[in-house]
Amino acid sequence: MRTLVFDVAGEYGQFKKPYSPMSPVSYPFPPPTAVLGMLGAIAGYDKTEYHERLGWRTARIGIAPQAPVRAFRAAINLLQTKDGVDSYFRPRAGQNTHTQVPFEFLREPRFRLYVAGLKEDATNRLAEQLASGRTAYTVSL
């Protein structure tokens, strides 16, 4: 079984916990679904096909933090765009279209990912992309 080992890092990251819709908090590390999404973006697989193309049922993922996990909260202004605004997103009189929501982010996250058990063609494609430093889609944390 071939294992791919590579680092991912960024200025900020957020891996939203699904049970926190009103005040989004983040996992301290990328969950397996996020790692599979990153792999799909690197390899260039569409979001509707990457699970099957990678072989997610047999995938084995390990994550090792390479920097201390530092979290912070920031209030984000959300703008309601369905009702109450015109086509230029200007609020109509008497209607509040902004909502401030505190989001939790990770500051300067850095992780080493260990990935094994992928389909052979997907492993070869990922290894080639990683070795050349290219991605098909932009990877975000």
Predicted regions and their residues:
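Short amphipathic
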Residues: T3-V8
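Structural motif
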Residues: Y12, R60-G62, R110-R112
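Short secondary-structure boundary micro-motifs
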Residues: E11-Y12, D46-T48, N96-H98
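Short N-terminal binding/cap micro-motifs at the start of the first secondary-structure element
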Residues: Y12-P18
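Glycine/small-residue-rich interface belts in oligomeric ring/scaffold proteins
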Residues: R2, P18-F89
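Glycine-rich, flexible loop/turn motifs
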Residues: E11, V25, P102
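Internal, well-folded beta-alpha domain core
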Residues: Q66-L141
